[in-house]
């Protein structure tokens, strides 16, 4: 509906250009917003005030002129001018009902799909050396939610799990694995549960033994030169690490697969060429033996230009080099229209610099959008980064285990007679959903406090509340199995029916915001409001006990569309729904 009003206003502006009211080359960004006070209509725009200077007319006079020139629309019941020149639109109830009716049988719930694009999404991307920890959660689940929404809206999405599978630390790991093999024979296997212990032991050996450190550095050189033995050990280690990652992804309900892994090592062969191409364009400068690029727009507090280090004095490459190679690949090979990076906000300057450099060096097409969608930190209840009681990093699997245990206790307390298998399955869904939703419901750019007590509450904007809200709506149809709705029509008469209908009609607008800004919390807020709108409707408007069949069938259709929207919205967040709780 919002996009429809915007389209009417766009046509009006074109008419003004033809009439000479506005200059022929005039361009305006039309903003249409939902009103908070329904006495002011359903939608409003300040377009008249925006056009005042260009048209040379006062806002109220211009507002009336806009209304007089609006194309006729069955969706608009009336239009009014308010205040200094706001234009308020009242949506026709029957037109809204028809829109909702069509949405019920549509796989996209009546949403008009945008022009499809090819969109690369870089997310999760853990370093392969240690087990995934809580610091990997946000990128993984925020990125996955946006990916799901992009695909639902018809875009071609290419997932890129840019894992850290290369670098000098692998010499240390390979050297330690080599020692273990020497002690235990070729049959020695590194178990997934040993990843943290293995890494810490290797680091300890590296710090304490000069001989070990020398061997580690030697192995880096051999690995980079393609030594078969080193590459074999390296592949084994990465395979173990990736197996662990994908076990976590499966538990989280994340859609990443092995086929989506395109890590740092994938660009090894391109790094030398990146350096040569930057040098050929005269962009490289020598600084303390390193090859760097200075860009005038990036300076420190003292006003000195900040370097992007491309190659270290010892010949080694850095993240910037790999990122530039990845950007070129995503532009020239993957043909991306947009590339979205879900990476910690603390990397903001890095991405600003490499995005600018990639454009400057023509590594990417000018029309390709590079977007760093950064996120804040998950903190403990003390307001500091989430840690174990001993100050260590919290493993993601341990966090999920704890969530499952607490969810099981919660579900059992509410269903003491339920069988263990059903309890376990419900607890699995509730526990994982609670962790994911607690994160996704927060503004991506904000830090937030992690609290099991809050996230497992059945009150407020939480996963348990929404999962229960869905089962409540779906439960209506368990009591209405013999009712034929094939000829039923939605009729909006009661104020609460209209409120619910208006909220349902906003789903497409919400999903557009999710994919435009990478903000799943907007969808979470919408689903919470939708559940509240349904609750108000259900209390005020008897469904199965309606006054007549026409009213009952209409309200059942509204309930069905609510269930469909809640389920689809939760699925786009990567959250399973339950039929009972």
Curated annotation (Swiss-Prot):
InterPro entries for this protein: aa-tRNA-synth_I_CS, Arg-tRNA-ligase, Arg-tRNA-synth_N, Arg-tRNA-synth_N_sf, ArgRS_core, DALR_anticod-bd, Rossmann-like_a/b/a_fold, tRNAsynth_Ia_anticodon-bd
Keyword Repeat in annotation: no
Any one GO molecular-function label of the UniProt entry: ATP binding
Ranges spanned by the short sequence motif 'HIGH' region, renumbered to the chain: 126-136
Keywords, in A-Z order: Aminoacyl-tRNA synthetase, ATP-binding, Cytoplasm, Ligase, Nucleotide-binding, Protein biosynthesis
BP-aspect Gene Ontology terms: arginyl-tRNA aminoacylation
Catalysed reactions, semicolon-separated: tRNA(Arg) + L-arginine + ATP = L-arginyl-tRNA(Arg) + AMP + diphosphate
One Pfam family, short name: tRNA-synt_1d
Documented EC number(s): 6.1.1.19
Gene Ontology CC entries for this record: cytoplasm
Subcellular localization, as worded in the UniProt entry: Cytoplasm
Similarity comment text for this entry: Belongs to the class-I aminoacyl-tRNA synthetase family.
Assembly: Monomer.
Name the record gives this protein: Arginine--tRNA ligase
Gene name of the encoded protein: argS
